């Protein structure tokens, strides 16, 4: 058992295979005082597999300021983990304002690296990846998505976008529509 420095630990979680988590991440999850996560029900699958029982706070874009206020009394005197449902926290996930709040208060923040769907997709793409741009999720509005596609066409580097599984076909059709020239 190692005593953790008080502050915020941004811990990457597995993308699909629960065994893809580092020993360091497991050790820190075992030792933190509580865990901030997107979906407690989802996070419990991983935590139960690891035999970890901790208090969970749910964090979303719409409640981030509320969570920041709820944990103010713990900042600086607790070790707190932030995890996402899958992959690296803050990569198209909530948590930016939380991290900024810790940094602005000069409270320790560190990243525990691990799975990243952005990096995995780049590695498997067969495209040059020494220079790339990540755009996050495709905008919901078709006009905004079309603008993004046009912007990507103008770039001469590999680009990564997130598209929810149910929307891939529609997005590919939009790419074809915007690529006729």
Where are the regions a protein language model picked out?
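Glycine-rich, flexible N-terminal cofactor/catalytic loop recognition
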Residues: 1-62
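Short amphipathic alpha-helix with an adjacent loop that forms part of the alpha/beta core around
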Residues: 68-76
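Short active-site oxyanion
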Residues: 29-35, 107-109, 158-159
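Conserved helicase motor
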Residues: 57-65, 137-142
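Short glycine-cluster motifs
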Residues: 76-135
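Short glycine-rich anion-binding loops that position phosphate/pyrophosphate groups of nucleotides
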Residues: 15-18, 85-89, 165-167
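Beta-strand/loop-alpha-helix module characteristic of Rossmann-like adenine-cofactor folds
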Residues: 2-6, 119-181
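Alpha-helix capping/helix-boundary segments
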Residues: 41-43, 117, 167
């Amino acid at each position: 058992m190692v005593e953790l420095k008080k502050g915020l630990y941004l811990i990457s979680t597995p993308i699909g295979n629960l065994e893809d988590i580092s020993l360091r991440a497991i050790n820190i999850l075992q030792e933190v005082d509580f865990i901030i996560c997107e979906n407690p029900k989802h996070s419990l699958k991983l935590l139960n597999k690891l035999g970890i029982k901790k208090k969970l706070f749910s964090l979303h874009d719409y409640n981030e300021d509320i969570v920041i206020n709820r944990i103010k009394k713990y900042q600086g005197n607790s070790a707190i983990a932030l995890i996402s449902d899958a992959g690296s926290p803050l990569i198209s996930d909530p948590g930016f304002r939380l991290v900024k709040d810790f940094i602005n208060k000069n409270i320790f923040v560190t990243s525990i690296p691990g799975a990243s769907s952005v990096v995995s997709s780049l590695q498997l793409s067969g495209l040059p990846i020494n220079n790339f741009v990540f755009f996050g999720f495709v905008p919901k509005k078709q006009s905004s998505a079309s603008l993004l596609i046009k912007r990507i066409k103008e770039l001469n580097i590999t680009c990564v976008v997130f598209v929810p599984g149910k929307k891939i076909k529609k997005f590919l059709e939009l790419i074809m529509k915007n690529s006729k020239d």
